[in-house]
């Protein structure tokens, strides 16, 4: 079958339209059986008037680009408006996110849930900044039996009874010692990915495929063949140095990337690039909501800060007593670590820095653009 997909990550109206145009014949007829489209939250209200999806996957609601969205309630209101534009659309919702779950319950669309019911991390007292501390239904402070990360976990409101539903697609027997391994009911999933957040991504794919009636007999093989989008655990080998590139553009995503870095106990160099172009969001105060102090235990031989807001990033690290080297030019920063580094380099970059860094690494590795 043929699928329309905005694989480049262009997730606003123009990018969505372009994905369909590229899959159309000269007469305007689509050469596709399915469409799988990522849509920017704020763009849903602009896209949905043009077509009504059969399904929408709601993965989580985190603060992102404060100057553009403001607080999380703005994003929730936009999504609620979009849902009302497509009343027959079915939702697949992350049950572990109280905000996504409330949004589904508060609208008339039919919904199905996915999530992880078992406690994976034993540490209860996390310093992470969490959304959804208070019940969206009655305003009472939420209580948690455990957290996975950010506000994701097993929650309930002690006053009105709003609580995490039991997921229809429930990940269990989680094992992250060698890639990712877990069960969904009687189905066993094995994937060569890192990062706890990827369990959620795979669960969402499994659930969406199940709801759409797509056969799952080749699910693990397809996972094995899939190459993640650039900047998502993207690995390079350059002059004997292992280079891992990851996009980190909000507190929750950054904390997950730091966690992935820390699963590698070998000595390493880390480069953090922060820009403040319009696509990044010009307000970088979110850096203060990231648990950078965890990097003290990352076995980092060096940490370099780069990009337009490298001074802000350096100041943020200074406040948790982490020394860093300042190099605004990302190419020079990379070359320095290739020449005098540990041969194990991690790059954490926000949105506009991703494309520049990716192209530099491809050129250094000798790949075709």
Language model: regions and residue ranges:
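Phosphate-binding loop of NTP-binding sites
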Residues: 1-115, 123-126, 130-134
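Short amphipathic alpha-helix with an adjacent loop that forms part of the alpha/beta core around
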Residues: 28, 49, 259-263, 292-294, ...
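Residue-level signal for inorganic ion chemistry
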Residues: 38, 59, 92, 201, ...
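A conserved, hydrophobic alpha-helical segment in the catalytic core
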Residues: 50-60, 152-166, 193-224
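Cys/His-rich short segments
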Residues: 117-180, 192
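Gly/charged, well-structured mid-domain segments that form the phosphate/adenylate-handling core
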Residues: 162, 174-177, 208-248
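Active-site beta-alpha connecting loops in nucleotide-dependent enzymes
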Residues: 229, 247-326, 364-369
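Glycine/aspartate-rich loop-and-adjacent alpha/beta segment that forms the canonical ThDP
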Residues: 347-369
């Amino acid at each position: 079958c043929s699928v329309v997909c905005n694989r480049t990550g262009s997730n606003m109206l123009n990018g969505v339209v372009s994905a369909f145009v590229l899959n159309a014949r000269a007469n305007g007829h689509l050469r596709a059986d399915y469409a799988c489209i990522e849509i920017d939250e704020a763009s849903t209200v602009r896209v949905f008037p043009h077509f009504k999806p059969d399904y929408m996957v709601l993965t989580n609601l985190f603060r992102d680009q404060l100057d553009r969205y403001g607080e999380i309630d703005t994003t929730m209101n936009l999504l609620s408006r979009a849902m009302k534009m497509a009343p027959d659309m079915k939702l697949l919702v992350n049950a572990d996110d109280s905000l996504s779950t409330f949004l589904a319950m508060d609208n008339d669309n039919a919904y199905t849930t996915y999530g992880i019911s078992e406690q994976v991390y034993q540490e209860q007292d996390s310093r992470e900044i969490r959304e959804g501390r208070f019940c969206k239904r009655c305003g009472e402070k939420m209580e948690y039996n455990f957290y996975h990360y950010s506000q994701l976990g097993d929650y309930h409101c002690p006053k009105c009874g709003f609580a995490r539903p039991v997921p229809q697609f429930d990940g269990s027997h989680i094992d992250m010692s060698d890639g990712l391994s877990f069960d969904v009911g009687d189905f066993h999933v094995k994937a060569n990915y890192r990062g706890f957040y990827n369990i959620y991504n795979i669960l969402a794919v499994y659930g969406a495929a199940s709801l759409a009636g797509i056969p799952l007999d080749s699910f693990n093989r397809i996972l094995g063949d899939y190459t993640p989008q650039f900047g998502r655990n993207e690995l390079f080998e350059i002059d004997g140095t292992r280079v891992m590139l990851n996009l980190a553009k909000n507190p929750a995503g950054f904390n997950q990337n730091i966690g992935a870095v820390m699963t590698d106990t070998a000595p390493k160099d880390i480069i953090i690039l922060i820009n403040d172009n319009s696509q990044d969001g010009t307000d970088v105060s979110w850096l203060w909501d990231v648990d950078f102090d965890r990097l003290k235990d990352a076995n980092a031989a060096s940490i370099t800060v780069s990009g337009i807001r490298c001074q802000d990033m350096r100041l943020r690290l200074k406040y948790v007593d982490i020394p860093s080297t300042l190099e605004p030019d990302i190419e020079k920063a990379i070359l320095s670590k290739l020449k005098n580094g540990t041969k194990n380099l991690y790059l954490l970059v926000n949105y506009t820095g991703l494309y520049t860094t990716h192209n530099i690494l491809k050129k250094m590795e000798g790949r075709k653009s």
